[in-house]
């Protein structure tokens, strides 16, 4: 019961924060002309899925950008398809045969050779709208201490199965209410896609955290520990694909659960050795995030 009450209180706080701050857009800077690297990590994705994402990224209104397709596939047919797509659409292809740090290691290797000021990341099944960068970049240009701007992740294939429909509903609660609360309490974390990051902020912490299966949240913690700020912009400019069967859904949830456990262990180490590294409300939000998947143990 204490576990449930704590998380219920956390959700209530998020709702209140959303009501207080949700209608007040943050101040944005002038229209940007900074360079942006659009990164699309892919591993064993169907050709048509990657192609759709490439097309939507290339169709963005913002022109000062370069598109990078990062292929981490181990099967030759997928590698060949990625090569064909990169050649057909004139995007830069980065192939990787390493196994260091999974997605984080792949992105870090690419980051080492980038010169662009900002990095936009979209999973291979996420389709951004043409105005995405025009809407998001002004916030980063207006605040030099803003490390990243996270936007919602909503699914467009909810009619495929009940699993997809339920996954969408689960995500909707998180992105509509919880994220607003976390952002207002200076603890919004990167969700790994539909996000634009400042490259210098990533360089400041040595790139994405390669020691966690949820590199996005672990990296966000590192940024907040270094006093970088984050922002959640609650406008849906990207639509993706939900898990369509129970196998895919449980694989997704298992990865998030494992990442939460890893985050909790790291938090405890910092909490008892360097409590002043975060503000009280940041600690509370990160503890709620890292213990969410403990709900099963709470009912044992």
Residue spans for each PLM region:
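A conserved acidic beta->alpha catalytic loop
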Residues: 71-82, 98-99
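Short, acidic, metal-binding catalytic loop of nucleotide-sugar glycosyltransferases
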Residues: 55-64
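Cell-envelope/extracellular polymer assembly enzymes that use nucleotide-activated donors
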Residues: 34-37, 66, 218
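Long helical/loop segments within the catalytic core of UDP-sugar-dependent glycosyltransferases
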Residues: 87, 94-118, 130-213, 224-225, ...
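Catalytic donor-sugar/metal-binding loop of nucleotide-sugar-dependent glycosyltransferases
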Residues: 211, 220-239
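N-terminal membrane-anchoring/stem segments of glycan-assembly enzymes
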Residues: 1-32, 86, 285-300
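A conserved hydrophobic helix/loop-capping motif in glycosyltransferases and polysaccharide synthases
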Residues: 37-45, 60, 139
